[in-house]
Design a protein with these regions (language model features):
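Hydrophobic/aromatic beta-strand elements that line small-molecule binding cavities or substrate pockets
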Residues: 44, 57-63, 77, 90-97
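A solvent-exposed, acidic/Ser-Thr-rich amphipathic alpha-helical stretch
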Residues: 17-70
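Short, well-ordered beta-strand segments in beta-rich or mixed alpha/beta enzyme
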Residues: 70-77
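Short beta-strand segments enriched in hydrophobic/aromatic residues
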Residues: 24, 77-79, 111
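Short, cysteine-centered beta-strand-loop-beta hairpins and adjacent loop/turn segments enriched
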Residues: 53, 78-88
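Short acidic-aromatic low-complexity motifs
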Residues: 1-26
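Short beta-strand edge/turn micro-motifs at domain boundaries
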Residues: 90-125
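Residue-level signal for well-ordered, solvent-exposed loop/turn and beta-edge residues enriched
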Residues: 29, 85, 102-103
C-alpha cells in the first residue's frame, strides 16, 4: 500500500491525472473538504488547473494493522497558484484500497480549509 500512496502523491504533485487514475479501481474518487467528491481524474485536473507549482513533503505513511485495507498519508502541501499566491498547509489523506486488486478505491482528504479558502477563494477555473 505504501508504494501506491507515494506514487499517487507524486502524480498529484506533478499534476498528472492519468498517472494518478492508473492507481485506482474504475470509478475511484477523491473527497476534498474544499472541492467535494470528484473522480480522481477530475480532482487532479482541477488542482493542476489552478496550480503553477506544488511540493509535497511527506511526514509519514501509516498502514492499517487490521480490518479494511487502509493507509493514511500525512504531509505538508506547499502550493503555488497561477496568480502567484502561495499557501502551505498540513494534510492527512485516508486511502481505502480494494482487497482483491490492491488498487486505491478512494481517498478522503482531511485538512483545515480556513487558510486554504483565504488564499484560493474561487481561483479554480
Amino acid at each position: 500500500m505504501q508504494p501506491a500512496v507515494h506514487k499517487y502523491l507524486s502524480a498529484l504533485e506533478a499534476g498528472d491525472a492519468e498517472r494518478a487514475a492508473s492507481l485506482f479501481v474504475p470509478g475511484g474518487w477523491v473527497q476534498s473538504p474544499f472541492l467535494g467528491r470528484l473522480s480522481v481524474r477530475d480532482y487532479v485536473n482541477k488542482v493542476a488547473s489552478a496550480s503553477s507549482k506544488a511540493h509535497l513533503t511527506v511526514y509519514d505513511v501509516l498502514v492499517s494493522a487490521e480490518g479494511h485495507l487502509r493507509a493514511v498519508a500525512y504531509y505538508q502541501y506547499d502550493w503555488s497558484l497561477k496568480d502567484g499566491s502561495n499557501v502551505t498547509f498540513d494534510c492527512a489523506d485516508v486511502f481505502n484500497f480494494d482487497s482483491d486488486t490492491g488498487r486505491i478505491e478512494s481517498i478522503v482528504l482531511v485538512y483545515d480549509t480556513d487558510p486554504v479558502r483565504a488564499v484560493v477563494q474561487n481561483k479554480y477555473p
